[in-house]
């Protein structure tokens, strides 16, 4: 595959997974709310979040190694093998420590206020939630501690699209298993057990595929270098600390938000944010497949292709996805009522804050990719700490006055600060390696961001004028997109024109 083909295949797989996720949310949320109580569904959401937080060091380890693999490149299989096999023992140790930490927190009663802030939950449901969390944590050790690292190794050889398509298949089976289980009367605890079993069975051919790819590319087992493995683990743990704030900003808000506003309001907040999270994954479909190619351009100091890849991200995430978010804002009141069976209150202002926050987040993705791809630890820690403090402090202060809308406002403010810091640090690093941040394209992207944000808030305030606002913002963004397209390098423009010709015109 060429770089363009790998990017398109990886993006297609990621979009397919988003479609599966979207269908899953549309289908499973009504099923869950029809068969489970709101507190039981709220516990389901809390379990997902606590699981993400409890595995933060493992994820930091995997992500750090993933970028190290990309920096080494496909031409040094022995060096890749040494790094991979030296990291396996420490990956297992990290996962086991996280599992023990979850068990200790549960038996110490530290998670009681997270699941049951009002002290009125059914005791059986609380115990079932804790058991489900323990099972999930243990399964992480068995299924992902090593295979996730292997998946990052093969991405170096251009196998990211294939792994992404496997992820689509797994998502389909997981979604189907959850929906069918609940429809047949399974409780929260039983549903989790079924999901773990199904996920493990579906992952077996993935393990076989990874083994075949390793053998094909001469990634033979070697004796671990314990000092190298320890060094990588310590560096990744430092990175994981910054990831805690990032995860809290994106998903973990619900953990402490339930203590501030109650489980019901937290459930409303999380459910409204669900479709926003789907769009967040959409941004990942652009940046994740781009990462191996971006790292190659940085290694080769290819300014033209670097600018082209950044421009392509902004064109898709801001102009095209931004238009979709404007359209979604106009239909969400109807969709949300049908989706939740009227059991959860919809707040258009909160959804607008989420959508604009997503657009700001997408603006910073190229800068974040440059910083993360080069494992600039100090920069990531400082940025994440500053933004995390703003996010958490803002939520605590604003929710007392504005409720869950205040939490949404705090998240938006955090994204603004994050974008400013990331762009500043990325352009500073590019200068150090004699590359240039594309300021002219960045300013055009900001114009598109501003217009789309105004359109989204306008629909929230003037819902009866939503069609007119959508048409005007779409026309403006198409004009901006056409102007934006002029700055593409010639070879990149030729490829993109073939993809987006109907939208951009001749």
Language-model regions: role of each:
Residues 86-117, 176-180, 307-361, 392-401, ...:
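Alpha-helical transmembrane segments of multi-pass membrane transport and lipid-handling proteins
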Residues 59-74, 155-156, 215-218, 272, ...:
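Helix-loop junctions and terminal segments of transmembrane helices
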Residues 9-26, 170, 194-210, 226-296, ...:
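Transmembrane helical elements of multi-pass membrane transporters/channels
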Residues 164-214, 385-392, 404-426, 472-477:
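Hydrophobic alpha-helical transmembrane segments
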Residues 1-7, 119-124, 188-194, 206-250, ...:
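Interhelical loop/hinge segments that connect adjacent transmembrane helices in multipass membrane
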Residues 29-53, 188-193, 228-239, 255-277, ...:
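Interfacial/gating helices of multi-pass transporter permease domains
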Residues 4, 8, 140-165, 184, ...:
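Membrane-interface junctions at transmembrane-helix termini in multi-pass inner-membrane proteins
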Residues 453-506:
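Membrane-proximal transmembrane or re-entrant/amphipathic helices at the cytosolic face
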């Amino acid at each position: 595959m060429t770089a363009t083909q790998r990017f398109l295949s990886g993006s297609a797989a990621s979009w397919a997974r988003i479609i599966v996720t979207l269908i899953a949310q549309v289908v499973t949320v009504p099923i869950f709310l029809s068969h489970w109580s709101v507190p039981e569904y709220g516990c389901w959401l809390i379990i997902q979040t606590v699981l993400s937080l409890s595995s933060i060091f493992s994820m930091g380890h995997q992500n750090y190694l993933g970028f190290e693999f990309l920096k080494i490149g496909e031409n040094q299989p022995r060096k890749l093998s040494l790094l991979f096999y030296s990291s396996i023992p420490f990956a297992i140790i990290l996962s086991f420590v996280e599992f023990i930490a979850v068990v200790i927190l549960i038996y110490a009663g530290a998670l009681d206020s997270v699941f049951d802030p009002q002290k009125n939950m059914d005791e059986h449901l609380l115990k079932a939630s804790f058991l489900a969390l323990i099972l999930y944590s243990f399964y992480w050790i068995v299924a992902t501690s090593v295979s996730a690292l292997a998946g990052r190794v093969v991405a170096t050889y251009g196998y990211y699209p294939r792994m992404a398509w496997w992820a689509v298949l797994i998502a389909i089976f997981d979604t189907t298993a959850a929906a069918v289980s609940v429809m047949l009367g399974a409780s929260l605890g039983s549903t989790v057990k079924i999901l773990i079993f199904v996920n493990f069975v579906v992952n077996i051919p993935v393990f076989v595929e990874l083994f075949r790819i390793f053998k094909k590319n001469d990634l033979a087992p070697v004796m671990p270098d314990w000092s190298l493995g320890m060094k990588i683990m310590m560096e990744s743990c430092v990175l994981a600390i910054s990831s805690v704030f990032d995860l809290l900003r994106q998903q973990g808000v619900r953990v402490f938000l339930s203590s501030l506003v109650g489980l019901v309001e937290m459930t409303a907040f999380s459910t409204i944010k669900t479709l926003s999270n789907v769009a967040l994954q959409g941004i990942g479909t652009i940046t994740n497949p781009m990462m191996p190619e971006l790292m190659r351009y940085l290694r080769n100091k290819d300014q033209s292709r670097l600018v082209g890849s950044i421009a392509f991200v902004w064109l898709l995430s801001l102009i095209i996805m931004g238009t979709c978010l404007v359209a979604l804002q106009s239909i969400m009141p109807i969709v949300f009522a049908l989706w939740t069976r009227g059991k959860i209150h919809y707040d258009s202002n909160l959804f607008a804050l989420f959508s604009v926050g997503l657009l700001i987040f997408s603006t910073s993705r190229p800068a974040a990719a440059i910083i993360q791809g080069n494992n600039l630890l100090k920069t990531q820690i400082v940025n994440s700490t500053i933004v995390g403090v703003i996010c958490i402090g803002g939520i605590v202060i604003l929710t007392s006055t504005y409720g869950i809308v205040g939490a949404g406002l705090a998240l938006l403010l955090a994204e603004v600060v994050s974008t400013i810091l990331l762009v500043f640090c990325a352009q500073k690093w590019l200068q150090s390696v004699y590359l240039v941040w594309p300021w002219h394209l960045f300013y055009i992207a900001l114009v598109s961001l501003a217009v789309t944000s105004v359109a989204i808030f306008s629909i929230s305030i003037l819902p009866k004028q939503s069609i007119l606002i959508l048409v005007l913002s779409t026309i403006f963004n198409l004009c901006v997109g056409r102007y934006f397209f002029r700055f593409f390098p010639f070879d990149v423009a030729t490829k993109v024109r073939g993809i987006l010709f109907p939208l951009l015109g001749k």
